[in-house]
Amino acid sequence: MAKMTTEEAFVKVLQKHGIQHAFGIIGSAFMPISDLFPKAGITFWDVAHESNGGIMADGYTRSTGKIAMCIAQNGPGITGLVTPIKTAFWNHTPMLLVTPQAANKTIGQGGFQEVEQMNLFKDMVCYQEEVRDPSRMAEVLNRVIEKAIRGSAPAQINVPRDYWTQVIDIELPPIVRLERQGGGAEAIDKAAKLLSNAKFPVILSGAGVVIGGAIEETKKLAEKLDSPVCSGYQHNDSFPGSHPLAVGPLGYNGSKAVWN
C-alpha cells in the first residue's frame, strides 16, 4: 500500500499502460491532474475545439497502434466529443475517453455545467464506468483502459470533479493482457485450400487486420498469391496504399480499380 493523491494514482495508471499523449481542452474540472503530465512523460495537445482533440486521438492511434486519451471540460466541452467518439467507435479505435463531471455532492441537482455524460456516450463506447469512491480511482481507470484495448473501441471513465486532490492509500492494480489467438489448424487448412483453388483471389482487408495486428502478414499473403488488395470502408489503414498490389478502398467512394 502507498499513500498518494487521486491524480497521482490516475497518472501512474496511465504510465503503466504506456499512454503518452492526451488531446483536447482542459478546464477547471481537470486542472489538478494536468500539472503532473510533463514529469510523467505525457504530452498534452491543446486544441481549438474539442472535436479536433477526439479526431487527433483517433488518428494518432490508427497511425501508431498506441492508445491515446482525449479530455474536455465537463458539460459543453464534453458534448464536443460526440462526433469523434462515434467515429472512433465505428473505426474500432481503442481510446480512453475521460469525462470530468460535476461535483459528486451536486450531481442530479443542477451542478456546474451538469450533463448526463454517461447516457450521452452509452452507444458510442464499448465500456463506461463512473468513479464512485476516490479510493477506487486507479482500479476503475485500469479497468476502463483494459476494456478499450480488448474491445478495440473507445471506453469512458466519468470522474466527479471533487474527487481530485483526495489522499488515498492503495496498491496500483496489475495490468492483465489477453493474448490474441490465431485460427485453428482445421480452419487454416480449409482457408488454404480455398485460396489455392481460387482462379482470381482478391483480398478484402479491414478492421480485423488492424485489430489483429496482421498488416505485415496480409502483405506477405498478397505477395505470395499475387492478389490485389482492396480496403474496407474506413480502413485504408489496414493495407499500405503505396504497395503495388493495393487497389484502393471499397465503398461508395471507392476506387475505379476496386469496382472493376
Model feature map: region roles:
Residues M1-N260:
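N-terminal alpha/beta PP-like core and its mobile active-site loop of ThDP/TPP-dependent enzymes
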